[in-house]
């Protein structure tokens, strides 16, 4: 949820959600959100939560209570946590979303070229390393000159590669979202700013369903607010 809070500040649309630390809080959170359905998401500083059982779609209050009880207080094991896992102290309760299409979008430092690169793929919701190994043609890149920044033509190069191409309003939303993600990357001193998946809803809206931000450790001295978000548990 911390990454989504940052996304929201930069105008990146995210689903409505509330954080809960108990079953009772989860129930109260759901009452402030559209639904059912809702989505219960384990909150740990690691990716791959869906495959680890840390993301559950629920269609009733009873299912929400059960999912929250199952997740809270237990270690979540993913590829990024190691075999010991990370204990879950919080869950995020989110509104359900009618998903039409899923994409992967990220800005990361390419160390071989010593510059940022925007990565975009139609294979959203999956580990991008797996996609790159299996279907490299699905992973598109635009390298960014730090002196110039993210340019509109680069966003169009990525978005207009989509087949089928979304509607005009949706295209505008994605183009704007790409620029916003690059601003997150630069202003927050990120080594990674990732949206996975970025979705188009059945209503034609672009939404950042899940996100991850890694901050360059060398920049934490000037990112005191972000340093305070670190979870040492």
Predicted regions and their residues:
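Glycine-rich phosphate-binding loop of ATP-grasp-fold ATP-dependent ligases
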Residues: 14-17, 40-68, 104, 126-128, ...
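Cap/lid and interdomain-hinge subdomains that line or gate substrate/regulatory clefts
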Residues: 127-170
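Acidic, glycine-rich loop-and-beta core segments that form the ion-binding/anion-interacting portion
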Residues: 202-233
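A long amphipathic alpha-helix within ATP-dependent nucleotide-binding catalytic cores
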Residues: 154-198
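A conserved helix-loop-beta module that forms one wall/lid of the active-site cleft
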Residues: 1-37
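Short beta-strand elements
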Residues: 42-44, 106-111, 118-122, 197-199, ...
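Hydrophobic alpha-helical hairpins/lids featuring a short glycine-rich hinge
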Residues: 78, 82-144
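ATP-grasp fold ATP-binding core
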Residues: 1-7, 33-50, 78-99, 105, ...
């Amino acid at each position: 949820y911390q990454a989504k809070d940052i996304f929201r500040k930069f105008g990146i649309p995210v689903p409505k959600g509330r954080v809960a630390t108990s079953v009772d809080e989860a129930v109260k959170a759901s009452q402030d959100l559209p639904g059912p359905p809702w989505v219960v998401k384990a909150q740990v500083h690691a990716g791959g939560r869906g495959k680890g059982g840390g993301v559950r779609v629920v269609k009733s209050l009873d299912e929400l209570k059960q999912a929250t009880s199952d997740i809270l207080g237990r270690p979540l094991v993913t590829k990024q946590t190691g075999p010991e896992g990370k204990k879950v102290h919080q869950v995020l309760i989110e509104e359900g979303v009618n998903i039409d299409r899923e994409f992967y979008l990220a800005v990361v430092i390419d160390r071989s070229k010593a510059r940022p690169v925007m990565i975009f793929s139609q294979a959203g919701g999956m580990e991008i390393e797996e996609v790159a190994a299996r279907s490299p043609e699905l992973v598109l890149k635009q390298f960014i000159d730090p002196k110039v920044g993210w340019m509109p033509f680069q966003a169009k190069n990525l978005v207009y590669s989509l087949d089928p191409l979304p509607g005009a309003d949706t295209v505008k939303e994605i183009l704007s979202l790409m620029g916003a993600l690059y601003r997150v990357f630069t202003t927050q001193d990120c080594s990674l700013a990732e949206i996975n998946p970025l979705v188009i809803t059945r209503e034609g809206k672009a939404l950042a369903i899940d996100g991850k931000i890694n901050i360059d450790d060398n920049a934490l001295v000037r990112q005191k607010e972000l340093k305070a978000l670190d979870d040492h548990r």
